[in-house]
UniProtKB/Swiss-Prot annotation:
InterPro entries named in the record: Ribosomal_Su5_D2-typ_SF, Ribsml_uS5_D2-typ_fold_subgr, RNase_P, RNase_P_CS
Annotated Pfam families: Ribonuclease_P (PF00825)
The name this protein goes by in its record: Ribonuclease P protein component
One of the record's GO molecular function terms: 3'-tRNA processing endoribonuclease activity
Keyword match Ribonucleoprotein: no
Record field: catalytic activity: Endonucleolytic cleavage of RNA, removing 5'-extranucleotides from tRNA precursor
Subunit description: Consists of a catalytic RNA component (M1 or rnpB) and a protein subunit.
Highest taxon of source: Bacteria
GO CC annotation terms, alphabetical: ribonuclease P complex
Described function: RNaseP catalyzes the removal of the 5'-leader sequence from pre-tRNA to produce the mature 5'-terminus. It can also cleave other RNA substrates such as 4.5S RNA. The protein component plays an auxiliary but essential role in vivo by binding to the 5'-leader sequence and broadening the substrate specificity of the ribozyme.
EC annotation from Swiss-Prot or TrEMBL: 3.1.26.5
Length: 141
């Protein structure tokens, strides 16, 4: 009972929007490449940049006022819960730097198996360096 009361008080004090005590912080659907018809032109553009952790395929676009992205993790990476964990982490990183991302880009990030051993902070620093080199990240604030 005490924990529930404390949680309600904390939510009220911090003015967090909550639905059934679950914080709503989700990447909006308009920023995600979902359809195959959206993803295949990105791969066919043949503009890519890679390192030991990621490969980013990207294409410039002017039709949308914002960026769109997709994440891809191969089965060699590990079991489903490991693949889902790395995708959740990268989505959180992208969400945190979304105001700084180039709005005229569609990009697909392919995650390699070596990224499995990294912590969240290491993954974030490597991704920010990588995104700055590929000019997907406009300014690192």
């Amino acid at each position: 009972m005490w924990n529930l009361y404390f949680l309600k008080l904390l939510i009220d004090v911090l003015n967090i929007k909550v639905k059934n005590f679950r914080i709503i912080k989700k990447m909006k659907r308009k920023y995600i490449l979902k359809k195959e018809s959206e993803i295949t032109p990105v791969f066919k553009s043949k503009k890519r940049y890679g390192n030991s952790l990621f490969i980013i395929y990207y294409v410039k676009q002017t039709a949308f006022p914002h960026f769109k992205f997709a994440l891809s993790v191969g089965k060699k990476y590990g079991k489903a819960h490991e693949r889902n964990l790395i995708k959740r982490r990268l989505r959180a990183i992208i969400r945190s730097v979304s105001p700084c991302l180039n709005p005229k880009m569609f990009f697909v990030i392919v995650i390699k198996a070596q990224a499995k051993n990294l912590t969240f902070q290491q993954l974030k620093t490597f991704f920010l360096q990588f995104a700055t080199k590929t000019r997907i990240l406009l300014s690192n604030k």
